[in-house]
Structure formats: C-alpha cells, structure tokens
Amino acid sequence: MTKRTAAKYKIDRRMGENIWGRAKSPLNRREYGPGQHGQRRKGKLSDFGTQLRAKQKLKGYYGDLTEKQFRRIYAEAERVKGDTGENLIGLLERRLDAVIYRAKFVPTIFAARQFVNHGHVEVNGKRVNIASYRVKEGDVVSIRERSRQLAIVLESVGLAERDVPDYLEVDHNKMTATFVRTPALGDVPYAVQMEPNLVVEFYAKN
C-alpha cells in the first residue's frame, strides 16, 4: 500500500465512515478509528465536536485540504449570494480535480489532484496543471491525447462502484467532460451524508 493510499484510508478510519464508498476501505472490515485507542467506544459528540467532524469530513473528502485552503473556499462561499452551505459545495465541486474524479477519469480524488498536477488535463483545449482551478458552466475538461491510454484512466472508466452525476456530460470515448451546471448538495453523489450547514455553524462560532 502506498503512502497516499494509506493516508486516504486513515481518513476513513478517523471519520469512522467509508466516505468515498470504496470497496477496499478498511471500514468495510472494521468500524473503529486508527491507532492503539481506535477500538474504544466513542461517546456522544458535543455540538462543537459534531460541527468539527462535519468540517473535517468535507476537507478529507476533497483530498484532505489544508485548513488554509478550506477556509479560503469557505470565505468565498460566504461572500456569494445565497445559502453559504450550498455555495460551499458548489465551489468544491467546481475544482478541476473534483471534476476529473466525478467524470471517472481517475479512481480517487487524490489521483485526480496528481493527474492534474502532472499536466494530463486540458480545459477548453488549454493545458491546466492546477488542481484547484475552478471550472465554469460550459467548460469542457478533457484528458490530453497522449494520456488517454494510461492504465489508471482505462481502469477507472470501467469502475462500477461510481456513477457520473448529471451535472456533467461525459464522453469516455473522447475523454471529455462538459461542466453543465453548478450542483446543489442534493445533486452530489456522496457515499455518506455531508452536512455543510454544520460547517457554517462551526465557522460562525470559531
């Protein structure tokens, strides 16, 4: 198991949930956190603990974002007109690495970040190597022609455990994904419940 894979599954164990719905998650075999004290029964969380956990789960889901990265996205969600929690989800789903993951071009959000950083992705025909790049409605994201036969891409396209959401129009023959619209929370195919409203409560008090 690579360090990246180990870190990913550590997030699952820390959250106590198989947050990406992966068949290989250790949470499919045991239901306790990492470390020597992981098997201790957890008590009921306080309001603060529940809010913190909701924030950590979202940060982890999108590739274990740093607090600085996540706080910056949240601050923008606050500035935009509308519900802050919904805005937060929309901004996270507009990240280029998230689009690559949702389109099933790669198997994990961690692989998506690395894939973008290594220059395998184009947006509207121009190479973009910034995972946090924010796509707009109508943008066409594609895998560069020289990268389309990579094993990681071919294997991911065939994965049965994930479906492509309807806010993307994906052509796996041409390896393109059009970002149709910014999704609402209910549109996003999370494997577990995400609660951005609790994230809003967390930052309102801290």
From Swiss-Prot:
InterPro entries: Ribosomal_uS4 (IPR022801), Ribosomal_uS4_bac-type (IPR005709), Ribosomal_uS4_CS (IPR018079), Ribosomal_uS4_N (IPR001912), S4_RNA-bd (IPR002942), S4_RNA-bd_sf (IPR036986). Keywords: Ribonucleoprotein, Ribosomal protein, RNA-binding, rRNA-binding. GO terms for cellular component: small ribosomal subunit. Pfam families: Ribosomal_S4, S4. It comes from the Bacteria. Residues 94-157 form the S4 RNA-binding domain. GO terms for biological process: ribosomal small subunit biogenesis; translation. One of its GO terms (molecular function) is rRNA binding. Residues 23-47 are annotated as: Disordered. Belongs to the universal ribosomal protein uS4 family. Part of the 30S ribosomal subunit. Contacts protein S5. The interaction surface between S4 and S5 is involved in control of translational fidelity. One of the primary rRNA binding proteins, it binds directly to 16S rRNA where it nucleates assembly of the body of the 30S subunit. This is Small ribosomal subunit protein uS4. It comes from Paracoccus denitrificans (strain Pd 1222). The lineage of its organism: Bacteria, Pseudomonadati, Pseudomonadota, Alphaproteobacteria, Rhodobacterales. The gene is rpsD.
